[in-house]
Amino acid sequence: MIEALEIVLLLVIQSLQYICRTCIAFLLIPFLGLYAFDLFLYVYRMILYLSQMFNYKRKLGRSKTNNRPHSPRLHKIYSSGDCMDTLIGQVRDLRVFLLSTIHSHSKRFFSTRFQTKSGINSAIDANDVETTSDVSSFTNLHLTRSSEEGYYIAGSI
């Protein structure tokens, strides 16, 4: 009899745990939904830039080797330091470009997600730019841009 009560009590406690977990998840869905789409766009942009980087490197390697695939002059050109310096310079420029775009996108993503009340008030920031308290147009522009990018991504899939 006591074992049966323990089993029933255990089942009741487990079912209450599941009910509480589903209620918490149901309450968190709107809160997470506000950020999930922007996080998806951020991850999508990062993957897009990485694929462009690998595609660029692959095309760069093909353009260097496909000009004269069996030419003995090609080995002499590769053995000189000029070609390697050019190749290293192009890869370095690509890395600088990718780092700057990744930095700008991550800065935009995190600044729009985690705005604080102190940053909204009108003041002069470190770059001597006046910030105003009217951010409604910026928010509407950001939401419009996010929805347009969402339609673009949905259309391209």
Curated annotation (Swiss-Prot):
- Does Hydrolase count among this protein's keywords? no
Q: Which GO terms describe its cellular component?
A: endoplasmic reticulum; endoplasmic reticulum membrane
User: Which factors induce or repress this protein, as stated in its UniProt record?
Assistant: Between 15 and 30 minutes due to fermentation progress.
Lumenal compartment residues: 30-33
| Stretches of the chain found on the membrane's Cytoplasmic side | 1-6, 57-157
For the keyword Hydrolase, the answer is no
Q: What is its main location?
A: endoplasmic reticulum
Going by the UniProt record, its keywords in alphabetical order are: Endoplasmic reticulum, Membrane, Transmembrane, Transmembrane helix
Disulfide bonds, paired cysteine numbers:
none
Q: Where in the cell is it found?
A: Endoplasmic reticulum membrane
Additional information? Present with 4280 molecules/cell in log phase SD medium.
Q: Write down what this protein is called.
A: Increased recombination centers protein 23
The lineage is: Eukaryota, Fungi, Dikarya, Ascomycota, Saccharomycotina
- Which gene is the coding source of this polypeptide chain? IRC23
